[in-house]
Amino acid sequence: MTNQHSAPLTYRDAGVDIDAGDALVDRIKPLAARTMRPGVLAGIGGFGALFEVPKKFREPVLVSGTDGVGTKLRLAFDWNRHDTVGIDLVAMSVNDILVQGAEPLYFLDYFACGKLSVDTAAAVVGGIARGCELAGCALIGGETAEMPGMYPDGEYDLAGFAVGAVDKSAIIDGKSIQPGDVVLGLASSGAHSNGYSLVRKILERAGARPDQDFHGQPLVDVVMAPTRIYVKQVLAALDRHGPAIKGLAHITGGGLLDNVPRILQPGMAAQLQRDGWEMPKLFQWLQQQGSVADAEMHRVFNCGIGMVLVVAADQADAVAATLREQGEIVNRIGEIVPQQDGMAQTVVV
């Protein structure tokens, strides 16, 4: 029954623009097409995406991961930088499943906003597609949710979902790690996607501007640098060195102190050398401007190390050489030692 005294309402009147959503899908399809890989049977456009596990996996185990970008999005809104957070979104999930030896196969995203800006959303999804290309996985589906009243104009939230596969016999679980094994660290590209609540607090205290010079670069480029994706490089090392790589840790929230212990068995500890790598200028500046203690830095930020590998001592040089061939900056940052009474499982000395 209609109200004869009121104009008819449409979905657009309620704040949902179906035409804008359709326009975004048209923008997304060619971006997703660039990420396609063998195994994709049906991608964007259907009710569900279909993927056939590659036959090279003899006894495949599926590995899944999901994550977001956290409060780094607040800076994306404030500084109008939307083309890199999509890479962050992919990186957070694919790097997580990589540590168990999995090859990422496909990725799905969720983009939620109050009012859909096609240009902003397309910039974000363009970053997601680029991240998928870097990881070698297909952007196989996603959801764009325009929800009036749920988010302020110009703001959005992101979630990502990655699925990969590893042969059951090749799962990396850290169980073979023993004292004497070497800890290698792969350089990060910046703060990645963690610790940004503290980053923002420090930027506010310092009165920082996105366009101010930071060692020859605009500060926005340094602070918003996308999370490095380690997938192809580490998979190449796994293909060549296999069991010599005993453990992998993605250095995310909790920094080195909380993430390295996740791959260690009871009674083992990682002793990291403070001078084993140079802390990048961004972290030095953040620490100085925020008067942040060393222990807090190591527990909040990656401090320049985005991925850790624990490798057999007699293969450490060979593994490092392979990773350098793949374009990684590799440092020998410590070793595995027996855990003494009262000793944390990761210490920086």
Swiss-Prot record:
- Its annotated pathway? Purine metabolism; IMP biosynthesis via de novo pathway; 5-amino-1-(5-phospho-D-ribosyl)imidazole from N(2)-formyl-N(1)-(5-phospho-D-ribosyl)glycinamide: step 2/2
Is Cytoplasm set as a keyword in this record?
yes
Q: Does the keyword Transcription apply?
A: no
Q: Record's GO cellular component, any one?
A: cytosol
Which EC number(s) does the record attach to this protein? 6.3.3.1
What keywords would UniProt list here?
ATP-binding, Cytoplasm, Ligase, Nucleotide-binding, Purine biosynthesis
For this protein, the record's Pfam families field holds:
AIRS, AIRS_C
Q: Which reaction does it catalyse?
A: 2-formamido-N(1)-(5-O-phospho-beta-D-ribosyl)acetamidine + ATP = 5-amino-1-(5-phospho-beta-D-ribosyl)imidazole + ADP + phosphate + H(+)
Q: Which GO terms describe its biological process?
A: 'de novo' IMP biosynthetic process; adenine biosynthetic process
The protein's enzyme class: ligase
Top-rank lineage group of the source organism: Bacteria
Gene3D superfamilies associated with the record: PurM-like C-terminal domain, PurM-like, N-terminal domain
**Per its UniProt record, what InterPro entries does this chain match?**
PurM-like_C_dom, PurM-like_C_sf, PurM-like_N, PurM-like_N_sf, PurM_cligase
Q: Where in the cell is it found?
A: Cytoplasm
Q: Which GO terms describe its molecular function?
A: ATP binding; phosphoribosylamine-glycine ligase activity; phosphoribosylformylglycinamidine cyclo-ligase activity
Xref: NCBIfam families:
purM
Q: Which PANTHER family match?
A: TRIFUNCTIONAL PURINE BIOSYNTHETIC PROTEIN ADENOSINE-3 (PTHR10520:SF12), TRIFUNCTIONAL PURINE BIOSYNTHETIC PROTEIN ADENOSINE-3-RELATED (PTHR10520)
- HAMAP family annotated for this entry? AIRS
Its family remark reads: Belongs to the AIR synthase family.
What is the protein name stated in its UniProt record? Answer: Phosphoribosylformylglycinamidine cyclo-ligase
